[in-house]
A protein has these predicted regions:
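Terminal targeting segments of Actinobacterial cell-envelope proteins
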Residues: 1-32
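Solvent-exposed, non-transmembrane regions of membrane-associated and secreted proteins
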Residues: 27-157, 165-244
Length: 244
C-alpha cells in the first residue's frame, strides 16, 4: 500500500468557501450617519460660541475697560475739568457684587456696554448725574458676557451701599428697594421719582438695571438707592468707610 503524502492530503482537503461580499450602506444609513456628523459639528460650534460669549468677551471687555479707566484717572490727575470726560465720568463701587470698580460712561447702547462698563441712560428718560440737586442717576450694564459688570446684582440687598466716585467727590447711596423682574419695556423704573420703588417725592436716587434671568434678556432686574451723604476726595483718594 502506497503511503499517503502530506501533499496528497492537502489536495484532497476541501477548498475554503469564498468570503461573503460586503453590502454597501443603504441610503437611510448614510443619511443617519451624515446627520450624526452634522450634529457633532454643530455641538462643537455651539460650544465654541458659548465659550466666546461668556468668557472671551469678558476678557476683551475687561482689558478695554481697564484701559479707558486709566485714561479717566490720568485726566483727573492732570487738573480740574468737567465731571464728564470722553472716556467716562467716574467709577461705580458696589461691595455686594464684589467686582471692584466699574467705569461709568454716557449711553447704554451695545457699543458702549460691550466695552465692559456701565452706562447712564440718555434715553428714553434722561438720567440725572450725581452732582444734580435732584433726580435719578440711572445705570445699565451687561449681566453676562462683555465684562458682566452686573452679573451679581441679585446679591445686593436693602441697606447695602452703592458708591459713585467722581474726580472730586464720593457719593454714597443706600439701597432701599429692588425689583427682581419687570418688563424690558417698563421705563417707569427710570423716572426722576421712581414711584415703583416706593419713592414719593423728589430726591437724589440711583437705579441699577440689567437683564434677567441670567443668560437671557427677557426681563429686567432693578435696584434702587438713595443718596445718604457726600464726601470730598482727599489727596490720597481715601475711600469712604463702605469701601474699606
Amino acid at each position: 500500500v502506497a503511503a499517503t503524502t502530506d501533499d496528497e492530503k492537502q489536495d484532497e482537503a476541501p477548498a475554503p468557501a469564498p468570503a461573503p461580499r460586503r453590502r454597501g450602506r443603504g441610503p437611510i444609513a448614510t443619511a443617519v450617519s451624515v446627520f450624526g456628523e452634522l450634529l457633532i459639528t454643530a455641538g462643537l460650534v455651539l460650544g465654541l460660541f458659548v465659550v466666546y460669549s461668556l468668557w472671551w468677551t469678558n476678557v476683551i471687555a475687561d482689558r478695554e475697560a481697564h484701559k479707558q479707566g486709566n485714561r479717566v484717572r490720568d485726566h483727573w490727575a492732570a487738573g480740574p475739568g468737567s465731571i464728564d470726560t470722553k472716556d467716562g465720568i467716574g467709577f461705580l463701587h458696589v461691595p455686594a457684587m464684589g467686582n471692584g470698580e466699574v467705569l461709568v460712561k454716557a449711553g447704554t447702547s451695545h457699543k458702549i456696554l460691550n466695552d465692559g462698563v456701565a452706562g447712564y441712560y440718555k434715553d428714553p428718560i434722561k438720567s440725572a448725574l450725581p452732582e444734580d440737586k435732584e433726580g435719578n442717576f440711572t445705570l445699565a450694564a451687561h449681566r453676562d458676557g462683555h465684562g458682566a459688570k452686573f452679573h451679581k446684582i441679585d446679591k445686593i440687598d436693602k441697606g447695602d451701599a452703592i458708591v459713585f466716585e467722581s474726580r472730586d467727590k464720593w457719593y454714597i447711596y443706600k439701597v432701599y428697594a429692588k425689583l427682581p423682574e419687570t418688563s424690558k419695556y417698563n421705563v417707569k423704573v427710570l423716572n426722576p421719582v421712581p414711584k415703583e420703588s416706593g419713592a414719593k417725592k423728589p430726591g437724589r436716587y440711583i437705579t441699577l438695571t440689567t437683564c434677567t434671568p441670567v443668560y437671557t434678556s427677557r426681563y429686567r432686574y432693578v435696584v434702587w438707592g438713595e443718596l445718604e451723604r457726600i464726601e470730598k476726595v482727599d489727596g490720597k483718594r481715601t475711600p469712604p468707610a463702605e469701601l474699606k
